[in-house]
Amino acid sequence: MSSPEADPIGPEVLQQWRKLTEEVREHQFRYYVRDAPIISDAEFDALLDRLTVLEEQHPELCTPDSPTQLVGGAGFMTDFVATEHLERMFSLDNAFSGDELNAWVTRIRAEIGNDAHYLCELKIDGVALSLVYRDGRLTRATTRGDGRTGEDVTLNARTIEDVPERLTVSDIYPLPEVLEVRGEVFFRVVDFQALNTSLVEEGKNPFANPRNSAAGSLRQKDPAVTAHRKLRMICHGLGHIEGFRPATQHQAYLALRDWGLPVSEHTTLVNDIAGVQGCIAYWAEHRHEVDHEIDGIVVKIDEVTLQRRLGSTSRAPRWAIAYKYLPEEAQTKLLDIRVNVGRTGRVTPFAFMTPVKVAGSTVGQATLHNPSEVKRKGVLIGDTVVIRKAGDVIPEVLGPVVDLRDGSEREFVMPTTCPECGTTLAPEKEGDADIRCPNARSCPGQLRERVFHVASRSALDIQGLGYEAGVALLAAQVITSEGDLFTLTEKALLRTELFRNKAGELSANGKRLLVNVDKAKTAPLWRVLVALSIRHVGPTAARALATEFGSVDAILAASPEQLAAVEGVGTTIAAAVTEWFTVDWHRVIVNKWRAAGVRMVDERDTSVLPTCEGLTIVVTGSLAGFSRDDAKEAIVARGGKVAGSVSKKIAYVVVGDLPGYKYDKAVELGVPILNEDGFRLLLEQGPPVQQVVD
């Protein structure tokens, strides 16, 4: 069959060809790269046929890179071509102390006075990216590079869920003709961990930290690889812009959000340096409540006119600074891997390392969780490893520095018998990652850990019964199990040197311990349930069980189906609770505690009225009279629920200092907002409470 005779190419034909080519390439990209087609195969075939016919009629349009000449996803490869930014992409100057921050404030006040407002943002530990939109359509994505020229990674950026292909038209902020927006590409911690797991399963080296993995994933030659890695992005600044001029940085973020671009929920506008310092202090304590890595707070002058007056140096804007927290990662030598037996019998490998200073404290040990995790992380004894200590979180080994290996490293071999009691180790069931010691009742290691857990803050919170005290009581056989804790006497404590003073009498610590043990007998039922060391039962599930059933006896009598039906419990926890109560010696512990006077029923304070019953409440910012846990406890105790995000279903948003974008979201959705006084009023009298904000 001969080809149709070639016709002259007119402007309409050329426009039609360009439109068809663009459509076909777009759908090929969605199908082969993003794995997320939006039209059927038949519809795509029809588009491709139309393009093929058009090129047969006009052979000069049929170029080697036409979709009709390429197979499948061919042609979608990132070449990292050097590309100039429309406007220079600066770095930030850093402050590592309060003095350095104050010095920056002093410098800028000398030029712009004291009337400026400050915008505080989380400094995301990721990789910088610049997006360019023309008439609302994404046309280019470029890495920072040297600030003037970066690498074109447009195809890869298009696979990021948060990066819109087209901007949303806003009723408030006009779409710019040209918009160059800057942001940070990163991994959520949970997605980083999942990526490393898959890499190890494929026999590849895992990434040492989320930042490295974000950079590596963004710079893949094959965009399909990037598409299958769950990169995220948050925008934090503007470059070149035509057709819109925000008056403030805060207004710019509101506009970006309206246009469908991702902005942080945790940006806070403050009036003075005291507000800045408060923000820095707050996030130093709460930084690990965010689902991605942060390494500081970025402080910016909010007013754009003042930003222009301050200008920039050769590398950084003078109107912004990054306050950096103490580094949470460090490199050190992995000297050995040894195992520890936990309270539920799980045998956990621990890394023993050359002590190193990280996040303000010295770290020499870190958990490796289980043998599968050791393999997933790819660490060998003798490796130089990257460790992380996140605030109060237990130190963690992130991975090895493979380039520093010298061949002397060796693999860790999991022991086959318990190091505490000699019992053969095994997974509880086939396929489990955790290896356990089945000698639950009498294994010294498990017994020690259970006693320590009973006294922990999340359980009965018995001051004075720390690890050393628990070991001493067991060693002197003052107690033989956690069941004996509530029958402690002065005479029994005198058998341990730890609780005797020089005169041979009971020490002050011993007296305090007896008082605190007695006090723990009246703890709420949920704390008793946590203290029993039932697998999977933490404070949340324990509260739900205590509220629903009201007593240990009722929980014991409930069927697995009844337990699982409780919100916050589910089938896994229900099965664990049912199984725990079938063990004879477990019931012996319950009966010993009951006989000693431990409260086994949920005796609720009748003075606490159910003022929040049926309400779902969000708490954001820092409250003066409540810790975050106290506020949650107060709401739950009154029958309410606590949510982590704002939606139209939320009854109230309680706002403290530095509330961030949850406050803005509440305003946008019309959700009632309460300050701390309003919150107290709600707790006391229940709804309706008139919106109360400062």
From Swiss-Prot:
The active site is at K123. It holds the Pfam family DNA_ligase_aden. SMART domains: BRCT, LIGANc. Disulfide bonds: none annotated. It catalyses: NAD(+) + (deoxyribonucleotide)n-3'-hydroxyl + 5'-phospho-(deoxyribonucleotide)m = (deoxyribonucleotide)n+m + AMP + beta-nicotinamide D-nucleotide. CDD domains: BRCT_DNA_ligase_like (cd17748), LIGANc (cd00114). GO terms for molecular function: DNA ligase (NAD+) activity; metal ion binding. Zn(2+) binds at C418, C421, C437, C443. Its cofactor is Mg(2+); Mn(2+). Keywords: DNA damage, DNA repair, DNA replication, Ligase, Magnesium, Manganese, Metal-binding, NAD, Zinc. InterPro entries: BRCT_dom, BRCT_dom_sf, DisA/LigA_HHH, DNA_ligase, DNA_ligase_AS, DNA_ligase_CS, DNAligase_adenylation, DNAligase_N. NAD(+) binds at D41, A42, E43, F44, D45, S91, L92, E121, R144, E184, K300, K324. Its EC number is 6.5.1.2. Belongs to the NAD-dependent DNA ligase family. LigA subfamily. This is DNA ligase. It comes from Mycobacterium leprae (strain TN). The lineage of its organism: Bacteria, Bacillati, Actinomycetota, Actinomycetes, Mycobacteriales. The gene is ligA.
